[in-house]
Amino acid sequence: MIHETAKIHPAAVIEGDVTIGANVTVGPFTYIAGNVTIGDDTEVMSHVVIKGHTTIGKQNRIFPHAVIGEENQDKKYGGEDTTVVIGDRNVIREAVQIHRGTTQDKATTVIGDDNLLCVNAHVAHDVIVGNHTHIGNNAILGGHVTVGDYAGVMALSAIHPFCSIGAYAYIGGCSAVVQDVLPYVLAQGNHAAPFGLNLVGLKRNGFEKPEIRALQKAYKELYRSGKTLEEAKAALVEMAKEFASVTPMLEMLESSERGIIR
């Protein structure tokens, strides 16, 4: 079903069970096929491909040559009906690729709200991206990667499959991340190493000075004190009783399967 207010260029091709919302625009030479839903006020520019079982929310902007919902690159994939789910107000720039999930995981790839995916960024199968993130030009999110809210993965960086990037973390350009990066941490290099907290990001997002000082203390316990990881965790448990912002660091320490960069 195509809403009567949608503007579809005559050179676009739409086939299958496609739902297009109010005030959506679809540019020339775009191909939309399969079980696709596009929410109200979304702009799909020219030469975009949207396929498979894909749901896109409202007020997104999708630039030329983006490919969304295509088959993933996992050799185990056998054509199962897996999905891509994209939220609202995202900017998906030129040649971004977002692949559908696999049945070996949650069978879906998820992009939240208010994210910027820059030119040629690659979002592999089963990736979960939160809200308000920045994924830089040519950045690669390997299969099953998780990126927390307000995190940044800068240009030409690669995140190894199954790694987690914590909320408000910042991965500098040209980095290779092979283990989890705790929330708030600034990391860079090949292999990526921690270089302090993402202080600029914390200040921009309204963290108060007492919170930032507590997070700096938590960082020092983990990375500068010479303590074992278990000893540092015990110190963070006490700190979290006063500062709730320390809790996400503890949660990732407990849930990490690949270990953290340290």
Swiss-Prot record:
Gene3D superfamilies tied to this protein: Hexapeptide repeat proteins, Udp N-acetylglucosamine O-acyltransferase, C-terminal domain
Self-association and partners: Homotrimer.
Q: Which GO terms describe its biological process?
A: lipid A biosynthetic process
Q: Does the keyword Acyltransferase apply?
A: yes
Gene Ontology molecular-function annotations: acyl-[acyl-carrier-protein]-UDP-N-acetylglucosamine O-acyltransferase activity
Designated name of the protein: Acyl-[acyl-carrier-protein]--UDP-N-acetylglucosamine O-acyltransferase
What is the catalytic activity of this protein?
A: a (3R)-hydroxyacyl-[ACP] + UDP-N-acetyl-alpha-D-glucosamine = a UDP-3-O-[(3R)-3-hydroxyacyl]-N-acetyl-alpha-D-glucosamine + holo-[ACP]
| Family as reported in the entry's similarity comment | Belongs to the transferase hexapeptide repeat family. LpxA subfamily.
Q: Name its cellular compartments.
A: Cytoplasm
Keywords in alphabetical order: Acyltransferase, Cytoplasm, Lipid A biosynthesis, Lipid biosynthesis, Lipid metabolism, Repeat, Transferase
GO CC annotation:
cytoplasm; membrane
What organism is the protein native to? Vibrio atlanticus (strain LGP32)
The family database entries (InterPro entries) matched by this protein are listed as:
Acetyltransf_C, Acetyltransf_C_sf, Hexapep, Lipid_A_LpxA, Trimer_LpxA-like_sf
Top EC class, one word = transferase
Q: What does this protein do?
A: Involved in the biosynthesis of lipid A, a phosphorylated glycolipid that anchors the lipopolysaccharide to the outer membrane of the cell.
Query: Which pathway does it take part in?
Result: Glycolipid biosynthesis; lipid IV(A) biosynthesis; lipid IV(A) from (3R)-3-hydroxytetradecanoyl-[acyl-carrier-protein] and UDP-N-acetyl-alpha-D-glucosamine: step 1/6
- According to its UniProt record, the EC number is 2.3.1.129
HAMAP family with a match to the protein in the record: LpxA
